Amino acid sequence: MLYFLPTPIGNLADITLRALEVLERCEVFLCEDTRVSKRLLHLLAQNPIISHSFPNIATKKREFIAFHSHNDQEFLNQIKPSFFDKEIAVMSDAGMPSLSDPGMSLAAYALKHNIQYDVLPGANALTTAFCASGFLEGRFFYAGFLPHKSKERRLKIAKILNALAYLEEKTPVVFYESPHRLLETLKDLNDLAKGMHLFAAKELTKLHQQYYLGEVSQIIERLQQSTIQGEWVLVLLNEKKIEPCMGLSALLELDLPPKIKAKIEAVMTQKNAKELYFQRLLEEKNQ
């Protein structure tokens, strides 16, 4: 049996009873970082309530195997489905497996090979931050971590905002970001989503948890005066309607004269308008 086991994102008290039962029962742990998972079990065992109800949670002999984005496919190619005849749990360092953490490929593998598995509900930064944001929209778009390089990051942000422009309703976008890239990401957001409101959550559920709300430029101004630490969740509210762009294929389907279509296509593709015009005439003749 395979279990997808959520772990606390900061506060150890957020562990669930079901998770504790699985932690004590399992023989093998597939871990994002084996050191972090071992430390979690050790810390949980220090709690007198947990140690009384689950005395073997840290003492039982079990196997810890690294399972992350750099080795997941290699691992799955090497094992046989019978490997999961044991009691096995997949764990990320913090939060829910598969949400910007290892696990999604394992679920696909289990489905393909008819392996029984269960996903335990539990703590994750995504829903915690969205609920804390105060944004009234009952839906959101989860973008996960943005690319490290500015050019790629800006391109991804632009693509997301452009895609959301086609929706009639406002749809907040949730990003994860690390402390050393936070200001760079906020500056990119400010350039591409100027005037939009942002909710930023620092170190959710931890001792130094903190919330920020305001326009992106205002949050940049506040954070530039402080030392940025901890993991962050950003919830961007796309309040301003972004005019969607019509794609080339959609434009060519409009009821327009061939010459007009050719001129539009030439501008969009940098091709010769005259050649495109004769191509459109030929297409209409063959219809």
Swiss-Prot record:
Pfam families: TP_methylase. GO terms for cellular component: cytoplasm. Its EC number is 2.1.1.198. Its main location: cytoplasm. Transmembrane segments: none annotated. GO terms for molecular function: rRNA (cytosine-2'-O-)-methyltransferase activity. InterPro entries: 4pyrrol_Mease (IPR000878), 4pyrrol_Methylase_sf (IPR035996), 4pyrrole_Mease_sub1 (IPR014777), 4pyrrole_Mease_sub2 (IPR014776), rRNA_ssu_MeTfrase_I (IPR008189), SAM_MeTrfase_RsmI_CS (IPR018063). It is found in: Cytoplasm. SUPFAM superfamilies: Tetrapyrrole methylase. It is an enzyme of class 2 (transferase). It catalyses: cytidine(1402) in 16S rRNA + S-adenosyl-L-methionine = 2'-O-methylcytidine(1402) in 16S rRNA + S-adenosyl-L-homocysteine + H(+). Keywords: Cytoplasm, Methyltransferase, rRNA processing, S-adenosyl-L-methionine, Transferase. It comes from the Bacteria. Catalyzes the 2'-O-methylation of the ribose of cytidine 1402 (C1402) in 16S rRNA. Belongs to the methyltransferase superfamily. RsmI family. This is Ribosomal RNA small subunit methyltransferase I. It comes from Helicobacter pylori (strain ATCC 700392 / 26695).
